[in-house]
Amino acid sequence: MNLVRTAMLLAFMTALFMFVGFLIGGRAGMMIAFVIAAGMNFFSYWNSDRMVLSAYRAQQVDERNAPEFFRIVRDLARNAGLPMPKVYLYDSPQPNAFATGRNPENAAVAASTGLLSALSAEEVAGVMAHELAHIQNRDTLTMTITATLAGAISMLGNFAFFFGGNRENNSNPLGFVGVIVAMIVAPLAAMLVQMAISRTREYSADRRGAEICGNPLWLASALGKIARGAAHVPNEDAERNPATAHMFIINPLSGERMDNLFSTHPNTENRIAALHDMAQSGMNVSTSPARAANPSRKSRSVPDTGLGRGGSQPPKGPWS
């Protein structure tokens, strides 16, 4: 079913891309847009995960430089019956995380240094279980391709003003009005698609993530902390790449952006309430992150992934 939804998404995004091309350059513009969209669809399938990880300058970590974090992901993946995903950290003070990849065999999970600083090991386990649930539900392909194409469509809508605003250009059937329509409609339509695919999937990933980690309250507690952190700590890379916002466990964009007029995520309080209801329904809860993980608290630093921005060291945290 996810394959059908992904195909429908690609078809819609391609049609939207062609529509903007038509408004800019008539039939010729529409055909050029079709060729570009077809190439982007092919490229996105194979490379969109790398593009997203690169946009956040995420660095891959392993058991040598992030032993406890890596072990938590490994044990959770075992609980879920998933292949071990690649594990990444990206330098950002905002606590957040996302998953990407075209299938479970080629998946990756990424967490911010701020997440490891702000959350306990149990809460981190809840977050990573949520991301593994997205991988298991095969949401990551759709979410990653949407991020790539939505960003391209928004950019095309902005470029429409510069490349399609020539009143003497007879190839544009709607003239300057059509260009204005493209500037407004294209980014809005892309944002609505992001909302549609993200909101319904977050609840499903929350539920499955709670089952994977064994305790819904870990994820509930983590969501509260991440939401408060995201509200006060900006994510500069996300602000520059708002099309990726729906990939994160909590919307990383600040409230100052118009992008937040239509949220890509369901209300955090409702998600937390659903997890509390799940815990109260009698679900067997675990007391340690994942089945085989029992993180020690001897380490007091975030795993070393190199210098942070401006040559500074990443912020210190309660565990690694």
From Swiss-Prot:
Q: Which residues bind Zn(2+)?
A: H130, H134, E202
Q: Which PROSITE patterns match?
A: ZINC_PROTEASE
Q: What transmembrane ranges does the database entry give?
A: 6-26, 28-48, 145-165, 173-193
Disordered: region residues: 283-320
Q: Which cofactor does it need?
A: Zn(2+)
Where's it mainly located? Answer: membrane
Q: Which Pfam families match?
A: Peptidase_M48
Q: Which GO terms describe its biological process?
A: proteolysis
- InterPro entries linked to this entry: HtpX_protease, Pept_M48_protease_HtpX, Peptidase_M48
Q: Which domain of life is it from?
A: Bacteria
Residues in the active site? Answer: E131
Which family does this protein fall into? Answer: Belongs to the peptidase M48B family.
Protein's recorded name? Protease HtpX homolog
Question: What organism does the UniProt record list as the source?
Answer: Rhizobium johnstonii (strain DSM 114642 / LMG 32736 / 3841) (Rhizobium leguminosarum bv. viciae)
